[in-house]
């Protein structure tokens, strides 16, 4: 449990699968009214790491979007591990933080007290957006 909580400080931006980036893509880049409405519906929940509107409204009905969700679940932990253990860019959190619904810049600051950890969170957000973007040619 402790190991899982150590890496969650930057991993699940917007919920499992880092779907905050997909929510913002739906909100700002979608060509269809359905995906844009889903982005409007899901942005409030995604800011508090609740991604069920996006998972069930977007990913479940478009199985092609399961691929980037799986890729983010594989790539982002590797990125966080490299930036915390090998490069030592951001500190490893020293405590368990179970308020998963706390928005990520706030929870990252509370658990690490480090600007570098917030930068790592933003790096993970950009990587997740780059993973979702080619798959989400939102019609």
PLM regions: where:
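Transmembrane alpha-helical segments and their short flanking loops
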Residues: 1-4, 21-23, 41, 55-139
């Amino acid at each position: 449990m402790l190991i899982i909580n150590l890496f969650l400080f930057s991993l699940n931006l917007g919920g499992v699968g880092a779907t905050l980036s997909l929510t913002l893509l739906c909100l700002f880049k979608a060509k269809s009214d359905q995906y844009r409405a889903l982005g409007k519906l899901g942005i409030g929940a995604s800011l508090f790491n609740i991604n069920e509107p996006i998972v069930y409204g977007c990913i479940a009905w478009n199985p092609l979007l399961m691929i980037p969700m799986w890729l983010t679940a594989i790539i982002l932990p590797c990125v966080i591990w490299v930036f915390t253990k090998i490069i030592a860019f951001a500190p490893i959190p020293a405590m368990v933080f179970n308020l998963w619904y706390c928005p990520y810049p706030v929870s990252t600051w509370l658990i690490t007290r480090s600007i570098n950890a917030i930068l790592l969170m933003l790096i993970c957000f950009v990587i997740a957006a780059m993973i979702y973007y080619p798959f989400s040619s939102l019609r």
